């Protein structure tokens, strides 16, 4: 018995700020869509140059401002990680970088020196509209080339406030509005307009269930890792979630493999080591909804869930709100 999509084939495109975001935020949706025969693509806006590096071996990849022996080669290294992650998720197109590889740079966090870099994706510049216009036109070109019915990106707050995440949200919605307006005005029969935009979010109840039992069993937390303090992981109330995508064991395994591919950024406690990080951590999370545990460079424990949560960001006129849900519905044959 095999699963097939209940609806016609579509193209799903995720627009993300940095390499690894496509996996952490939307990896399950992309893997499931591909398994069901849909086309999937990812547009990455920067190379993630400001990321911290897990493990000792490749600390010198970061900039000299972060590490005395820093070489500033992290962005290039993360291209290779992104390639492997996309392969694990089944993404056929890419890597695709907004405006081309290296056009835009990781801005870092609010108030950092890096956000004033001339190529910073969310650069603090006047007039800000000029920067936005350039990025929107580049994204429109990608949309017209890839022709996605569904676009996945962040909510207006970027998920946790990162300037690049918020900028990705802005350009997605501005691009869709411009395309929708051009189509309505009859600017050209060849103008492709997506059907739906969804925002990836971390749902509070799902996250809490994935962490269930860890406080009562300290041995379940990998050595050297910590549990998140209250509010340390940004979540949204379950009442605000419009779509929950449940992944099969195959989908979750694909996301987990993609997470391992981003070894400089993600540490998966699944008993495996890598060239980047020789240290091994194992986990046996008590919660049934958590496949394994992982952390970023901050060593804060998080669960790899068997689902992802989304909010509706925009739906084209005449398109049902459950458009993407229908596309991911499975029928057994």
Curated annotation (Swiss-Prot):
Its cofactor is Zn(2+). Disulfide bonds: none annotated. Binds 1 zinc ion per subunit. Keywords: Hydrolase, Metal-binding, Zinc. It catalyses: 1D-myo-inositol 2-acetamido-2-deoxy-alpha-D-glucopyranoside + H2O = 1D-myo-inositol 2-amino-2-deoxy-alpha-D-glucopyranoside + acetate. Zn(2+) binds at residues 18, 21, 165. GO terms for biological process: mycothiol biosynthetic process. It holds the Pfam family PIG-L. Its EC number is 3.5.1.103. GO terms for molecular function: N-acetylglucosaminylinositol deacetylase activity; zinc ion binding. Belongs to the MshB deacetylase family. Catalyzes the deacetylation of 1D-myo-inositol 2-acetamido-2-deoxy-alpha-D-glucopyranoside (GlcNAc-Ins) in the mycothiol biosynthesis pathway. This is 1D-myo-inositol 2-acetamido-2-deoxy-alpha-D-glucopyranoside deacetylase. The gene is mshB.
């Amino acid at each position: 018995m095999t699963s097939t999509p209940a609806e016609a084939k579509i193209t799903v495109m995720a627009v993300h700020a940095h390499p690894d975001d496509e996996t952490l935020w939307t990896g399950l949706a992309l893997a499931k869509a591909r398994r069901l025969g849909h086309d999937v693509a990812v547009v990455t806006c920067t190379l993630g140059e400001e990321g911290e590096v897990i493990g000792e071996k490749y600390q010198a990849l970061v900039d000299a401002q972060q590490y005395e022996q820093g070489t500033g080669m992290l962005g290039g290294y993360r291209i290779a990680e992104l390639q492997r992650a996309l392969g694990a998720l089944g993404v056929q197109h890419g890597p695709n970088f907004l405006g081309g590889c290296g056009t835009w740079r990781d801005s870092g966090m609010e108030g950092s020196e890096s956000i004033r870099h001339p190529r910073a994706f969310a650069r603090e510049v006047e007039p800000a509209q000029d920067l936005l216009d350039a990025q929107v036109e580049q994204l429109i070109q990608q949309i017209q080339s890839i022709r996605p019915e569904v676009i996945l990106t962040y909510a207006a707050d970027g998920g946790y406030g990162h300037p690049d995440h918020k900028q990705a949200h802005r350009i997605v919605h501005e691009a869709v509005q411009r395309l929708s307006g051009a189509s309505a005005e009859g600017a050209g029969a060849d103008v492709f307009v997506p059907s739906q935009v969804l925002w990836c979010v971390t749902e509070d109840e799902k996250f809490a269930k994935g962490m269930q039992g860890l406080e009562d069993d300290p041995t379940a937390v990998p050595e050297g890792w910590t549990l998140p303090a209250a509010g340390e992981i940004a979540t949204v109330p379950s009442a605000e979630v419009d779509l929950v995508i449940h992944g099969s064991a195959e989908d979750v395994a694909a996301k987990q493999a993609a997470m391992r591919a981003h070894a400089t950024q993600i540490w998966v406690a699944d008993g495996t080591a890598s060239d980047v990080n020789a240290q091994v951590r194992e986990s046996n999370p008590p919660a049934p909804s958590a496949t394994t545990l992982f952390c970023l460079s901050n060593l804060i424990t998080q669960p790899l869930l068997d689902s992802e949560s989304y909010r509706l960001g925009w739906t084209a006129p005449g398109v049902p709100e459950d458009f993407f849900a229908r596309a991911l519905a499975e029928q057994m044959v």
